[in-house]
Structures are given as structure tokens and as C-alpha cells.
């Protein structure tokens, strides 16, 4: 269960949010339920939000202030034990510790594993030293940790027990001015996207301002649908769907929930081909409109042309 991401650098908060969102869009399994999201703000103060259900999409309107260069999140299925803050530890001016599996379990130090790693950091240990100490001293505990310090140093690792699993997710990139690490398990991906490679690419592009091979678009509000000789989607500069053309001879028909963003559809922006849909969106189709439905993910992945 669970995915954890920590990042440092330009727009670290956005990078983490988009990393979890991309995991929800591209993956299936233990995702899209509870979320804990933490940042060290522009003053180094620890700020945290959490929710039990709905995944990162439910934080879509979260007001992320500028100046955040240190951020972390943990997410999995819904309805985890309260308080959700136990799953992600943070301290003003010091850093954040997230993870996957059960990072809040009590370890050999008598503290929760994530809090114990944070305490080691407070005593002067680098993040990778703090994480290695926890995994070495608790080899059969069911956890992996990612620690990020306020100065940008990142450490991550799994216990020996977790490392024996055959469903692990791990991707990272650490450089002087920016870095991130992502750990997860029990999440299975769309093969067209090279799974976690695409997610890491999206995170890195946000951290550094570089271009990614893929991007996330959304049917965030009702969009007009028309009969067309070929499928197409038009999006705006922010990735929102402006209109959809359908060559499917079944439509128009009775109103209902169906695939309105279809895998392989060409995506257009400002009269230029922007890319190709990698994932689908199911929504209510009727009265000439595709309307997002609360029971379905409304974001979708696009491979750039």
C-alpha cells in the first residue's frame, strides 16, 4: 500500500502534488484515497493538510504559496487511522519525513519510524544517514522512508522486509539545486507510459522548469461534444478541455457515463497538435456535453508530439 514522494527545488510543492496526481492517473491499486501533504513554507514553517478520501484531486484548489522549496506527500486507499498526521512527520526549519507501507509504526527507538528519523536529523544526521539507521535497526518492520531536509538533502530506503517485495516502485533524481525521491508498492501502471519513468519526468520538469515528455490535462468542467469524421480533443493553455470531437458511430445515443476522452485521441492546442491521449476519462455524455462525474477521475495523461 501507499506511495510517498519528497522533493526539493523550484516549485517543490507543485512537483509533489503533480507526482501524486500522475500516479493516480497512470496507476491502479492502492491510490486515490487518503492524502497527507506537507511543506516547509517560505519562512521554514511546517504546514500540513490531509484528507481521507478523494486523493490528490480533492486538493486541486489547495492554495500553495510561492517560496516552497521543500515538500512531501503520502497517499494510498481511503479511511486510514486518525490522526492522518502520523503518516508524515515534519518540523519547522528542519525537514520532512514521508514513506510507504507503515512509516508510522513504533520502531526500536520507541518512537514512530518517521519521527525517529526526523529526530536523528535534529541531532545532526544527514537524511540518508537517518533513513539508513532506521532501516538497519528495524530490518523486519514493514516500512520505507523518504527524508528531505530544509537545505535540500534527501535520503530514502526500504527495510529488508519491504525490499523483498516484488511490487516495489522506486524512482529518484538528486542534483545540487533540485531533487526528488518516490517510493511505493501495490500500484500498477499503464504500460504505454513506462509507468514510474513518466511520473519522475513530470516531477523533474516541475522542479527545474524543463519540458516533460508527457503532461496531465483535465476535463474539469462540462465541454461541448460534436460528431466528427475523426476523434479530437481541444485543450487550453492550462490543459483544460475546450471541446471534443467523436467519430464513434454509436453517439449520439441515450445519456450515460462513457469514455469521452479516448486512448489514442489526438490532442490539439491553439490549432497545433499537442500530443496523444495515453489514458481515458469516463464522464456523463448527453445534451451535447461531456460532464465530469464524481465517481471517475477527470484528469488524463498526454504524450507530447
Predicted regions and their residues:
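N-terminal nucleophile
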Residues: 1-305
Amino acid at each position: 500500500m501507499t506511495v510517498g514522494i519528497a522533493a526539493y527545488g523550484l516549485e517543490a510543492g507543485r512537483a509533489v502534488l503533480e507526482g501524486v496526481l500522475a500516479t493516480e492517473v497512470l496507476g491502479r491499486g492502492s491510490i486515490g484515497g487518503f492524502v497527507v501533504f506537507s511543506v516547509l513554507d517560505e519562512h521554514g514553517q511546517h504546514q500540513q493538510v490531509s484528507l481521507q478520501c478523494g486523493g490528490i484531486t480533492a486538493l486541486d484548489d489547495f492554495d500553495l504559496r510561492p517560496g516552497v522549496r521543500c515538500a512531501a506527500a503520502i497517499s494510498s486507499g481511503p479511511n486510514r487511522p486518525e490522526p492522518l498526521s502520523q503518516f508524515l512527520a515534519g518540523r519547522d526549519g528542519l525537514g520532512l519525513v514521508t514513506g510507504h507501507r507503515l512509516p508510522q509504526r513504533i520502531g526500536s527507538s520507541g518512537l514512530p519510524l518517521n519521527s525517529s528519523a526526523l529526530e536523528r536529523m535534529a541531532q545532526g544526521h544527514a537524511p540518508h544517514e537517518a533513513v539508513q539507521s532506521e532501516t538497519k535497526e528495524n530490518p523486519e518492520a514493514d516500512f520505507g522512508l523518504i527524508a528531505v531536509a530544509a537545505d535540500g538533502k534527501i535520503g530514502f530506503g526500504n527495510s529488508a522486509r519491504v525490499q523483498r517485495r516484488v511490487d516495489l516502485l522506486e524512482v529518484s533524481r538528486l542534483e545540487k539545486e533540485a531533487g526528488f525521491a518516490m517510493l511505493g508498492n501495490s500500484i500498477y501502471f499503464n504500460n504505454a507510459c513506462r509507468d514510474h519513468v513518466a511520473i519522475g519526468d513530470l516531477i523533474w520538469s516541475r522542479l527545474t522548469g524543463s519540458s516533460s515528455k508527457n503532461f496531465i490535462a483535465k476535463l474539469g468542467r462540462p465541454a461541448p461534444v460534436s460528431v466528427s469524421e475523426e476523434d479530437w480533443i481541444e485543450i487550453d493553455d492550462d490543459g483544460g478541455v475546450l471541446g471534443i470531437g467523436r467519430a464513434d458511430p454509436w453517439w449520439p445515443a441515450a445519456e450515460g457515463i462513457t469514455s469521452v476522452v479516448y486512448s489514442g485521441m489526438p490532442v490539439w492546442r491553439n490549432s497545433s497538435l499537442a500530443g496523444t491521449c495515453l489514458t481515458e476519462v469516463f464522464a456523463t455524455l448527453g445534451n451535447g456535453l461531456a460532464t465530469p462525474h464524481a465517481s471517475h477521475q477527470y484528469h488524463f495523461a498526454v504524450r507530447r508530439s
